[in-house]
Design a protein with these regions (language model features):
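Active-site and adjacent substrate-binding regions of carbohydrate-active enzymes
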Residues: 1-444
Length: 444
């Protein structure tokens, strides 16, 4: 397959399908709703859509917990709807990126259902199982969503690893059969006609096989980062993926690589590396100085933001390609975060940030609603939040006495992922033109 660099001239628009456009009045966005808005997206100047996961899922983490890699989630539509989306988008010169979630599956995936049945089940080694240590977890790692990163399973009296929710068990990439299953699935979707992959937490698929304790860093659990992020076989796995799948198609790839350095980004995305086209780095959106990660009310330092952006522009130039983003489904709204969402300054802030984004070298990623200057929702009651991360951390940190409830609620208002997940505001009506029914989450 002749490969081209078409992605260097692309403008990518991220759709969070649950919140984009509901076509049937059930309060949940869907594929026909996306098709309905393709002309709007073309007029906007978009030529690539990255659509967050639309595959079968119990929705513990809004689709990032996949239970079947070859079926469309029923509330979003059917495979026929998805094929029509591909056809209609391609007619308009718009390409489609699939969100590839292969660090973990849902615990309702058939592989995991089989894996937990017995220690000698053929699927046992599809996941990461360890014996208890002194009757407790195999090590002190904490999950990215709060609580321990290990879940005890009484069926076989062992623990399985989940770096995210307990309903998101990590796949064992050391197992060649797992890797082949993933590559077969990727080839299936490429044959359907998709144009590439955004790879969810892809830098976490290779783990240090000694599973040592992590540093506590003032929290309740140890940090898994040094042992699971940019792990010992990560580049070997991605080069194998390139040989088995990516080199066969003229597709675009971008990897989510939390904590990546300039040097590491060159390994992932250097043109001679045969791995990825680009990565998402998060240095410009990382919180500094909090014992509890992002849960703080400290204001962002805009001068520091500019320094980070300049550094990545200058030091990656000619070595690897930059991805450019200010927000996504995991971040607060960029206008509220980096600008000023006071009505007097919201529009000016949004235009300033858009100018910043589109005038740098790299591929820009616009998150749905960013083009309208959408702001944080500032929900002030816990029951208004749907995000598993927000709810679990609120409970964990307040129950442990590490944060006062009022302060933690202020943190949620500023930092919760739900700020980005309120329905797209198509008009100024009560339900924002998103749905005729009751929206799954409150309208901003």
């Amino acid at each position: 397959m002749k490969k081209t660099d078409w992605w260097k001239n692309a403008v990518v628009y991220q759709i969070y399908p649950r919140s984009f456009k509901d076509s049937n009045g059930d309060g949940i966005g869907d594929i026909p709703g996306i098709i309905e808005k393709l002309d709007y997206l073309k007029e906007l100047g978009v030529n690539v859509l990255w659509i967050s996961p639309m595959l079968e899922s119990p929705q513990d983490d809004n689709g990032y917990d996949i239970s079947d890699y070859r079926r469309i989630y029923k509330e979003y539509g059917t495979m026929e709807d998805y094929e029509k989306l591909l056809e209609e988008a391609h007619k308009r010169g718009i390409k489609i990126l699939m969100d590839l979630v292969v660090n973990h599956t849902s615990d309702e995936h058939n592989w995991f259902i089989e894996s937990r049945k017995s220690k000698d089940n053929p699927y046992r080694d599809y996941y990461i199982w360890r014996e208890p240590v002194n009757g407790k977890e195999p090590n002190n790692w904490g999950s990215a969503f709060g609580g321990p990163a290990w879940e005890y399973d009484p069926q076989t009296e062992m623990y399985y690893l989940h770096l995210f929710s307990r309903k998101q068990p990590d796949l064992n990439w050391e197992n060649e059969k797992v890797r082949q299953e993933v590559y077969d699935m990727m080839n299936f979707w490429c044959e359907k006609g998709i144009d590439g992959f955004r790879m969810d937490v892809i830098s976490m698929i290779s783990k240090d096989q000694s599973y040592p304790d992590g540093e506590m860093n003032g929290g309740l659990y140890g940090d898994f980062g040094p042992y699971c992020v940019h792990g010992p076989r990560i580049h070997e796995f991605l080069q194998e993926m390139n040989r088995e799948v990516l080199s066969r198609y003229d597709v675009m790839t971008v990897g989510e690589t939390s904590g990546v350095t300039i040097e590491e980004a060159q390994k992932y995305a250097g043109e001679d590396r045969n791995e990825l086209n680009m990565v998402f780095q998060f240095e410009h959106v990382e919180d500094q100085g909090s014992d509890h990660g992002k849960w703080t009310t400290e204001k962002y330092d805009f001068q520091e933001f500019k320094k980070v952006m300049i550094k990545w522009q200058e030091e990656l130039a000619g070595k690897a390609w930059n991805s450019l983003f200010l927000g996504n489904h995991d971040q607060p709204r960029s206008v509220s975060r980096f600008g000023n969402d006071n009505p007097a300054y919201r529009e000016t802030s949004a235009k300033m940030l858009a100018t910043c984004l589109h005038m740098m070298q790299g591929t820009p990623y616009v998150y749905q609603g960013e083009e309208l200057g959408m702001t944080n929702a500032y929900f002030c009651k816990l029951e208004d939040y749907k995000d598993i991360e927000s709810i679990q951390y609120y409970t964990e940190l307040t129950d442990a006495g590490l944060m006062e409830p009022d302060y933690m609620m202020k943190c949620l208002m500023l930092r919760s992922r739900d700020n980005a997940r309120t329905p797209m505001q198509w008009d100024d009506s009560e339900k924002a033109g998103f749905t005729d029914g009751e929206p799954w989450i409150k309208i901003n």
